[in-house]
Amino acid sequence: LTNVFPNIVEKTKVDENGLEYFIKVTDNINQKNESKSKIAEKIFSFKKPIVTYSLIFICILVFILMYVLGNGSTDNYTLLVFGANVDTLTKNGDYYRLFTSMFLHIGILHLLCNMYSLYIIGKEVENVFGKVKYLIIYLLSGIAGSILSLAFNHNTICAGASGAIFGLLGALLYFGYYYRTYL
């Protein structure tokens, strides 16, 4: 070995005795693990999903109001009055429908499926990204979903939080890939 690597003895020589060197290396490893542990603890510590609960509350409240103030969540006129997305109105200047439609749901099953999905996925995304980033992801994804809905559904009333929820799922997939060493 010394023939191949003539400087190996000088390079591997340690001034400390073996035990002191072992303790020093172990301490360095422990410090690095402790700092990584703090990062993981910060990322994965549970926080109350207030934004998720608020979004669910808003969707349920709007659903109830559609029955109290209109003819229910499956009535086309009521959906349009409450801000459902339809290409003829949105393209003629009712751009608010890109936003409002993500809080409307057509029928109880649509509402229940979306709110269950929002609860399961939303609380995780809110926990790892924080309240502000979570809300930004939700709203931008919902608007993007509304725009895509306009592109593919002509003369069709569109509503629901599915676009926003798929955006949250995408954010969760990104998180899983980016932080895969912590999972």
Model-identified regions with their sequence ranges:
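A detector for small-residue-rich transmembrane helices and their helix-helix packing motifs
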Residues: 1-183
